[in-house]
């Protein structure tokens, strides 16, 4: 049986097309994916992301626990409210999930994890927490709303009290503060500025309606996917999973290798993989007509000029750029060109760094893009 967020009736009343997303009935769009996408790039849009899982961790040794559990190092989080992005790995170095962790207070951290991996995540965390005396509290009482776009923060700020506005003023990216009943974080999944706001479920409908009245457009999963793809952000189950190393998913920057004595889960496997030259994740741009899709095979050449193959992990038409873009897993060291066959035609691709649009601006040169380095 599919689950519903507390905002389900609101979505239906606003004309959303609802679909089953990993067991949750979620809005795909409210009439126009393209208009919703452009609203986030040019103004402000909002997403119900209450299907995601919020987990609070408590304990005297909770920091030690997370330094063991996560590939990134929460020792970097010294200021309450600061957050970081990390992979949670298995012993083989595969990605169980990618998540955001917040340092809330002494002996208290908060995780926000994916809905599709909820049960596996909770089981994995629960398996390793007892050795550190950590208490796990899933926050089913909270809803989560993402407000994204160049005017998102100012539109939300206008709804806050003067005291609340002062508390969130000047917050840098990847930071969160509890302001009254709202936990407001400067995070997102679109490549735009904005907030992700956790709040009690019994306040969510009224707050959503306030956001609508403030001129913020409701957006669905379809726009969320094209926005994150333009931003070069991974989607669990496509760019990475339990069989794929973060080194092959453009997540090497999230691995904290220092200090060398920190023995996080999966470290030994990653150290072995480093010497084996794992695959890499690249961006693709196709300027000819056609749409790149996940699962397509691409042809390319390796560092020695020999033919090799890669696989598209995510692909779509880019509403911002007006052409097709994709993320693809390929051998290390390929050149700046690749090819794909669509409907019997071999079409040329430019190989670029993952990430195509940020803050509404193209990261791709108008002519042939610069090739990805090793």
Swiss-Prot record:
Query: What Pfam family is a match, any one?
Result: GCV_T_C
UniProt KW DNA repair keyword: no
An example Gene Ontology molecular-function term? transaminase activity
Which of UniProt's keywords are assigned here?
Aminotransferase, Transferase
Q: Which Gene3D superfamilies match?
A: Aminomethyltransferase beta-barrel domains, Aminomethyltransferase fragment, Probable tRNA modification gtpase trme, domain 1
Q: A biological process (GO) annotation for this entry?
A: glycine decarboxylation via glycine cleavage system
> Its GO CC terms?
cytosol; glycine cleavage complex
Q: Top enzyme class of this protein?
A: transferase
Give the highest taxon in the source lineage: Bacteria
- As recorded in UniProt, its EC number(s) are 2.1.2.10
Q: Does the keyword section mention Transferase?
A: yes
Instruction: Give the range the annotation lists for the signal sequence.
Output: none
Q: Give me the reactions it catalyses.
A: N(6)-[(R)-S(8)-aminomethyldihydrolipoyl]-L-lysyl-[protein] + (6S)-5,6,7,8-tetrahydrofolate = N(6)-[(R)-dihydrolipoyl]-L-lysyl-[protein] + (6R)-5,10-methylene-5,6,7,8-tetrahydrofolate + NH4(+)
Q: What does this protein do?
A: The glycine cleavage system catalyzes the degradation of glycine.
Name the HAMAP family on file: GcvT
The subunit structure is: The glycine cleavage system is composed of four proteins: P, T, L and H.
The entry sums up its family as follows: Belongs to the GcvT family.
This protein is called Aminomethyltransferase
Q: What organism is the protein native to?
A: Edwardsiella ictaluri (strain 93-146)
Please state the gene responsible for encoding this protein: gcvT
């Amino acid at each position: 049986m599919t689950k519903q967020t507390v905002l389900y009736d609101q979505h239906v009343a606003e004309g959303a097309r609802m679909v089953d997303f990993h067991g949750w009935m979620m809005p795909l769009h409210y009439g126009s994916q393209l208009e919703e996408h452009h609203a986030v790039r040019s103004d402000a849009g909002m997403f119900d992301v209450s299907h995601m899982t919020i987990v609070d961790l408590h304990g005297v040794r909770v920091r030690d626990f997370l330094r063991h559990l996560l590939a990134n190092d929460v020792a970097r989080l010294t200021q309450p409210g600061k957050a970081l992005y990390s992979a949670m790995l298995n012993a083989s170095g595969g990605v169980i999930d990618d998540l955001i962790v917040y340092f809330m207070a002494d002996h208290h951290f908060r995780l926000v994890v994916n809905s599709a991996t909820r049960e596996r995540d909770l089981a994995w965390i629960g398996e390793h927490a007892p050795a550190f005396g950590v208490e796990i509290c899933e926050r089913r009482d909270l809803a989560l709303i993402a407000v994204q776009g160049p005017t998102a923060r100012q539109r939300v700020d206008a709804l806050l009290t003067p005291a609340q506005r002062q508390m969130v003023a000047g917050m840098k990216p990847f930071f969160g503060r509890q302001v009254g009943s709202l936990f407001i974080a400067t995070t997102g999944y679109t490549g735009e500025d904005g907030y992700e706001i956790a709040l009690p479920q019994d306040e969510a409908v009224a707050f959503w309606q306030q956001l609508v009245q403030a001129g913020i457009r409701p957006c669905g999963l379809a726009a969320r996917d094209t926005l994150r793809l333009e931003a070069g952000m991974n989607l669990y189950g496509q760019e990475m999973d339990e069989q794929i190393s973060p080194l092959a998913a453009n997540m090497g920057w999230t691995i904290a290798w220092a200090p060398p004595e920190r023995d996080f889960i999966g470290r030994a496997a990653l150290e072995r993989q480093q010497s084996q030259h794992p695959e890499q994740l690249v961006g693709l741009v196709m300027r000819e007509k056609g749409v790149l899709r996940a699962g397509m095979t691409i042809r390319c050449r390796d560092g020695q000029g020999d033919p090799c193959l890669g696989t598209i992990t995510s692909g779509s038409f880019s509403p911002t750029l007006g052409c097709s873009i994709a993320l693809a897993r390929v051998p290390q060291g390929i050149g700046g060109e690749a090819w794909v066959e669509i409907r019997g035609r071999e079409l040329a691709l430019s190989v670029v760094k993952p990430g195509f649009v940020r803050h509404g601006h193209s990261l791709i040169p108008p002519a042939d893009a610069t090739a990805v380095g090793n």
